[in-house]
Each structure stands twice: as C-alpha cells, then as structure tokens.
C-alpha cells in the first residue's frame, strides 16, 4: 500500500501515557503505534533522546498515529523524573493523557503523583488503561482495582465515575495474541480517547495575547511593540490592553507589520510589530503583554507546582529555605518573588518537586497553567507552573 501523504484535515491532539514505573506505559505506546501508526518497537521508544526545555534536560519519546477522526502526537517518558519535569515545564503539551495502571498492583505512589501533577498543571482529561489483566485470574479483583482507580481520580477532582477505564493487555496486543484482551482493547481504548478527550481549541481561536519583547518609537508614527503572538488574532483597529508590571492601560492597534511589510492582521505564531495609538515609549516595557481587553488580569500571589534542578542539571548545589527570593521568569522577563513553603516543609533540596506559594514584587499578566522558570542571576535553577492564582 502506498504511503498516504500527511493531510492536515483531521483535528490534531497532543496526548501522553502516564502512570507508575513498569505498569506498561511504553509497551502500550508501542501497541498503539502497531494498530494506528507506523509501528515503533519498544526499544525505539524507550531509548528516547534527551531534549532541553527551559534549560532542563528531559528524555521524551514522541510518536504519532491517527484514528479515523484525529491525528495524535503522543509522548512517553522513560523515567519518573522525566515525567515530573515534562509536565511542569510543559515541554510536551498534553491535551489529555492515558493513565496506565497494572491490574495486578492497582494504583501505586507514582500513579497518585501523576494524577496530582495532571490536575496541578491542567491536563484537561484522562482515560485509563488497566493493563496486564492476564495476570489477574479473579474477576472480582479487577472490579475492586477499577473502583480504587475511580475513587483515586475523584479524590483529585477528576470525574472518577465518568472516566472510561479499558482493561486489557498491551503485551498481548504487541505480540498479536489473544485479541479479546489485546488488539480489540487497544482499539476500544483509542475509541474512548477519540470520544472522551476534548479537541483543544486552536491557538488562533483563543483570545489574543502577545508577550512584549521590545519597544521602539518611530518618529511621526508612534510606539511599536514587537513579539510573537502566543494566541488569537490581532486586527488593525482592534482595542487592546497592555497588562502587567504597571497599571493596565487600553489602546488601539493602528498597524501590524511583519518582515517590514504592513499587514491587516497578525495571528498565533507570527512575529509582529504592533503600532499602538497614543502610547508613550516610556509607558510600555518588555515583560508586559498585549491582550484582548478583559481576557487576562495582573496578579502577584499564586500557588505553583515546581521542579528544582539538581546540581548535575546546572541547578543549585544546596537546599533553599523559607523566604527564598529568586527571580521568576515569565514569558519575557524576570520578576523577583518570595517563596512561602508548605507547612511542615523546612527546606527544599535540588531535585525535589513540590507545591509552594509565591508573592511577586510586581504584577504579571497571569492565568492558571502559565509556565515560568526560577532563576538566580540569570541561571535557571528550577521550573514551575501556576496552579492557582491567590491575589
């Protein structure tokens, strides 16, 4: 059969496998590619190359496959630490995830941690694959494990009663045996993923936002700010807000240019210059954002989920304590902030991941799910994500 050319007429969804070590995430990933993509052997996936995201090295394997209705990009990580880093940095954006649980063991510590991380970093939906069912003889035991998984999901505010749980064997599917627990279950799983994990809103359909990277004044024309449009569309004549650092101001975009050509609009992914009406060059600075009025608000206090780099990763060599004051790098700029550790936590070691509160000295345009780097004098010592805005 001739290879079909890749067509972008299907909606694209980013997905990943999560769950406890050795519960079968990579085997399941390989099995899905066997039926829905170009087959990748287990060791091709497991020997994932290292990548850098926000100065942090992460091993991740990427595969792609498609169902009748969708195209998927799927990420699988070899080690637990890679998952933590991946989810916190957002290196591989996940629109949904497949939680793999070994039916013989039930939920284990990393099962819990990955569900918590998915909740904290805003993975919208999970589907469960209960793996290795051929190792469980007792039908009642499977039902108990399923109940336990549902209760666990509910305890982390996922809709435990509604989440699809498919029980099968990824290995049987890989080896092409016992289709009733193998191939058929992989197909059932992907049908559930197709139906249950929502199609993400495309970046251009979201409200306009552009982090400001640079500010120029052009004599006779006014002030131009440059940056890459993160999401949405900006048209000449649109009213926009400038948010963060200083008080929010409203202006009108009187021109959009790209590669020195004038355009009537800029959209997600474009590097543009936007001409702002009646705005003084001194009134805008790097680190602010241009956005659709009312879509994003400035904040100084938030709760974050963070990963602190190890010494080997170029991070700190020593722990930090209460009232630690590093810089938090949001989008295009550093803002100093003070860390409040959770009750009972005295210190944080390099290599830890934890939840803490931050209070910044200046407000930043912020929403849940915003990623940041933690820096000391320009050196990255950690990465985090805003899990909850406090003030």
From Swiss-Prot:
Pfam families xref list: GTP_EFTU, GTP_EFTU_D2, GTP_EFTU_D3
Binding site for Mg(2+): 26
Record region (G2): 55-59
Enzymatic class: hydrolase
Gene Ontology molecular function: any one: GTPase activity
Compartmental location: Cytoplasm
Domain called tr-type G: residue spans: 10-201
InterPro entries for the chain: EF-Tu_GTP-bd (IPR041709), EF-Tu_GTPase (IPR050055), EFTu-like_2 (IPR004161), EFTU_2 (IPR033720), G_TR_CS (IPR031157), P-loop_NTPase (IPR027417), Small_GTP-bd (IPR005225), T_Tr_GTP-bd_dom (IPR000795)
GO cellular component terms listed in the entry, alphabetical order: cytoplasm
Domain of life: Bacteria
Positions of the UniProt region annotated as G3: 76-79
Reactions that this protein is recorded to catalyse: GTP + H2O = GDP + phosphate + H(+)
Protein name from the UniProt record: Elongation factor Tu
Source organism: Ruegeria sp. (strain TM1040)
């Amino acid at each position: 059969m001739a290879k079909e050319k890749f067509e972008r007429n299907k909606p694209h969804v980013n997905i990943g496998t999560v769950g406890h070590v050795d519960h079968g995430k990579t085997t399941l990933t390989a099995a899905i590619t066997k039926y829905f993509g170009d087959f990748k052997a287990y060791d091709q996936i497991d020997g994932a190359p290292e990548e850098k995201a926000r100065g942090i090295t992460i091993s991740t394997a990427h595969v792609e496959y498609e169902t009748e209705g969708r195209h998927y990009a799927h990420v699988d990580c070899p080690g637990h630490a890679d998952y933590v880093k991946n989810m916190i940095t957002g290196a591989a954006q996940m629109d949904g995830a497949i939680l793999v649980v070994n039916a013989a063991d039930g939920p284990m510590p990393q099962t819990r941690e990955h569900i918590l991380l998915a909740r904290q970093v805003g993975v919208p939906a999970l589907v469960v694959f209960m793996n290795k069912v051929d190792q469980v003889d007792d039908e009642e035991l499977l039902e108990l494990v399923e109940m336990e998984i549902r209760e666990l999901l509910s305890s982390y505010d996922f809709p435990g009663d509604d989440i699809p749980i498919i029980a099968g064997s990824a290995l049987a599917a890989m080896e092409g045996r016992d289709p009733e627990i193998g191939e058929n279950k992989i197909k059932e799983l992907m049908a559930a993923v197709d139906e249950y994990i929502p199609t993400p809103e495309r970046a251009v359909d979201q409200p306009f936002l552009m982090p400001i990277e640079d500010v120029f004044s052009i004599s006779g024309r006014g002030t131009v700010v440059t940056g890459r449009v993160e999401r949405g569309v900006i048209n000449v004549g649109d009213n926009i807000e400038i948010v963060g650092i200083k008080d929010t101001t409203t202006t009108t975009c009187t021109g959009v240019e790209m590669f020195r050509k004038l355009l009537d609009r800029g959209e997600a992914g474009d590097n543009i210059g936007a001409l702002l009406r009646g705005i003084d060059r001194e009134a805008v600075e790097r680190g602010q954002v241009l956005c659709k009025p009312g879509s994003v608000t400035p904040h100084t206090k938030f709760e974050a989920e963070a990963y602190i780099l190890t010494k080997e990763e170029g991070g700190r060599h020593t722990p930090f304590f209460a009232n630690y004051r590093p810089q938090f790098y949001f989008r295009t700029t550093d803002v100093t902030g003070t860390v409040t550790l959770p009750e009972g936590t005295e210190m944080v070691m390099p290599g830890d991941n934890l939840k803490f509160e931050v209070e910044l000295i200046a407000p930043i345009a912020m929403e849940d799910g915003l990623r940041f780097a933690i820096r000391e004098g320009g050196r990255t010592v950690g990465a985090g994500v805003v899990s909850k805005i406090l003030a």
